[in-house]
């Protein structure tokens, strides 16, 4: 099981990216964020501090997810 991180991404400290997750190019993953298994964060998206994504979630291109959100 492999996670994939695209080019020119920013992954801040204490961010957790689990198995089979895909972070496309130019994404910013903030501190204390959990990207659960098989989730996809599409190109150019910002995922705020403390966000948790459920397994298999797809975050659309150029999305902005507010800090502390739960994405189902």
Model-inferred region functions:
Residues 1-72:
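Structural signal for interior beta-strand "rungs" in well-ordered beta-sheet cores
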